[in-house]
Amino acid sequence: MSGLGIMVLTLLLLVSMATSHQDGRGKQATQRDAINVRRRRSITRTEACYEYCKEQNKTCCGISNGRPICVGGCIR
């Protein structure tokens, strides 16, 4: 095989490796965004629980079946 053929094959290999590496970054960014959305939702639920229980002069001890658990004091 000529030197030019080897150079072309090497170039194709490098391009395919670079492309697959960039695809991996895109997947990581998508996963990171999904995790951030989940965290924001849980923070919102927790804040809503605290506000709901504060109106009843109780403490929010968590959420069960989508409903806040409000008691005088949490046991952990």
UniProtKB/Swiss-Prot annotation:
InterPro entries found in the cross-reference section: Conotoxin (IPR004214)
Tissue expression remark: Expressed by the venom duct.
Location (main, coarse): secreted
Single annotated GO MF: ion channel inhibitor activity
Signal peptide segment: 1-20
Propeptide: 21-45
Record carries keyword Signal: yes
Subcellular location: Secreted
Disulfide bond entries: 49-61, 53-70, 60-74
Pfam families: Conotoxin
Domain of life from the UniProt record: Eukaryota
GO cellular component: extracellular region
Keywords: Disulfide bond, Knottin, Neurotoxin, Secreted, Signal, Toxin
Annotated family: Belongs to the conotoxin O3 superfamily.
Domain comment as written in the entry: The presence of a 'disulfide through disulfide knot' structurally defines this protein as a knottin.
Name of the molecule in the record: Conotoxin VnMSGL-0112
Organism: Conus ventricosus
